[in-house]
Amino acid sequence: MKVLIILNDLKNGGVERVLSVIANYLAEKGHQVHVLAIASDCVSYHLAQNVTYEYVPIMRIYKKEGLLKEFKIMSQIHKEIKRINPDAVLGFDDSIIIRSVPSAWLQRKRIVVSERIDPSIYGLPMRIVRQVAYDMAKSVVFQTVDAQKFFPMRTQRKSIVIPNPLTENLPYRVAETNKDIIMACRLRSQKNVHMAIRAFAKFYPGHEDYRLVVYGEGEQLEELKALAAQKGVAENVVFPGHVSDIHKRMTECAMYLSTSDYEGISNSMLEALAIGAPSVCTDCPVGGARMFIENEVNGMLVPVGDEDATAAAMAKIADDPAFAKAISEESVKIRQILGADVICPQWEALLCD
């Protein structure tokens, strides 16, 4: 079976990581896998040698915004699908889906698409276009039941819920070796790092030996630094950027924090749970955190945007080592249900059976 995966790029991000895991698994099982990037040639995730990777700068060829640009992009994608001639086409990002599915449908390819974020954030025009694309697909994959229920019954009937596979060979947390509260995310509004800083400022009195360490890059960096200074915690809020050893740092940290306003399923959250980092996460749409965190059993759930509850949850973990140890030991059990050997065969069945 020849499978074409179309994406913007393979730079750091949850969608990109999951697609790389799926691509490598399918190739290992003997399928021909072709990964086509159309926005940039940035590759941050390993692809197996028998995965064909190709960058075609479709998104950079046409500069002027408008319907003509969209038509030209879709026309070029149509040509690439015809050239590669796959049996099945897989798309995750909505911008990729609406641009590639019509061409794949016209060429009678098996189409599998996946909703990766809170579907309610889009306005009516985007929802209509997305639904047209989903109607053309053979199968639609959702990360959560809440996301699945958002769509009409005709979409639900041909859909399945498949959570994200874990990164392979994750280390285990041995013991807390520093006082870092770590986040791993892009610095953009969806992640609401502003709330994390405000919560940390409330947590800080009595916990002056702790730091909030935010790994990641993005357009909000300077305003986040300014907020930390305004709250008087600039010395204890640091932004190291992207690091290659984030999993090792998760094994050493005091706790992991995610304050997103909405998510599909946070990959860094799943990794933190699997490693055993005591975790505090917002119970945000579309329900990914609550799928895997039972409050005060294997982590802490807090309401979206609630800095007081977030500060209190951090304090509970910091002030009660026995509690922190208990939720850490419980959270690693997630490995039993989210290993690539459990998740990826479900993708293979959709694409290749």
Question: Which role does the model predict for each range below?
Answer:
Residues I5-L68, P152:
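N-terminal strand-loop element at the rim of the active site
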Residues E294-E296, M300-E307, A315-P321:
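Conserved acidic donor-binding segment of nucleotide-sugar-dependent glycosyltransferases
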